[in-house]
């Protein structure tokens, strides 16, 4: 089932998530719905708070970027991937700046500096403990989605100057003046159908 994506300004995006305690049918259904929602929105990552949920969980699918990732010489694990209770246990001192976007902040893209490489510990879809070392685009997407689980958005990393330049489009989102090619939920819990 395709779920509506909560848009910038909704409090659900600023709440910290709760660790997932066990693998249940309801969890598996949520994972299926999140993957379907991500694909419907042509996204490469989606975190539970973006669909109004509090589970410490996100999904990614970098298949659309597989060629670019291969050209960079980075391995790409089988996709899609599920990350339950993820934690970054190591990150490189070296950083890289790259443009990011977010399904919860439609049509806004800005450069963000992040560690180039990370090591993440998490549980997979089968609730098995895993550890993954990632660089390049995979590292960036994992960090971006992991931030959502602590109520952090990529716009939080921007300079005050860049934030001022985004004031109008972000205010429009907060006021519910937003459209996307996928269903949204505004800060007032109003559903905006896909355009």
UniProtKB/Swiss-Prot annotation:
- InterPro entries attached here? Peptide_deformylase, Peptide_deformylase_sf
Keyword Protein biosynthesis attached: yes
**Residues involved in Fe cation binding:** 102, 144, 148
Q: Does the keyword Repressor apply?
A: no
The UniProt GO MF terms for this protein read: metal ion binding; peptide deformylase activity
Identify the EC number(s): 3.5.1.88
Cofactor(s), by name: Fe(2+)
Record's function text: Removes the formyl group from the N-terminal Met of newly synthesized proteins. Requires at least a dipeptide for an efficient rate of reaction. N-terminal L-methionine is a prerequisite for activity but the enzyme has broad specificity at other positions.
Q: What is this protein called?
A: Peptide deformylase
Q: What gene name is listed for this protein? A: def
């Amino acid at each position: 089932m395709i779920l509506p994506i909560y848009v910038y300004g909704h409090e659900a995006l600023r709440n910290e998530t709760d660790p997932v305690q066990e693998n249940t049918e309801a969890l598996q259904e949520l994972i299926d719905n999140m993957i379907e929602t991500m694909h419907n929105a042509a996204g490469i990552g989606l975190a539970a708070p973006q669909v109004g949920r509090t589970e410490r969980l996100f999904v990614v699918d970098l298949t659309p970027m597989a060629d670019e990732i291969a050209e960079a010489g980075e391995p790409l694990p089988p996709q899609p991937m599920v990350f339950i209770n993820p934690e970054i246990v190591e990150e490189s001192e070296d950083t890289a700046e790259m443009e990011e976007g977010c399904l919860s902040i439609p049509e806004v893209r800005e450069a963000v500096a992040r560690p180039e490489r990370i090591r993440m510990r998490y549980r997979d879809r089968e609730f098995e403990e895993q550890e993954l070392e990632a660089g390049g685009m995979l590292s960036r997407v994992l960090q971006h989605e992991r931030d959502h689980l602590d109520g952090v958005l990529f716009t939080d990393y921007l300079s005050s100057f860049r934030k001022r330049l985004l004031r109008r489009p972000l205010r429009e989102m907060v006021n519910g003046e937003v459209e996307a090619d996928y269903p949204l939920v505004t800060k007032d819990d109003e559903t905006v159908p896909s355009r």
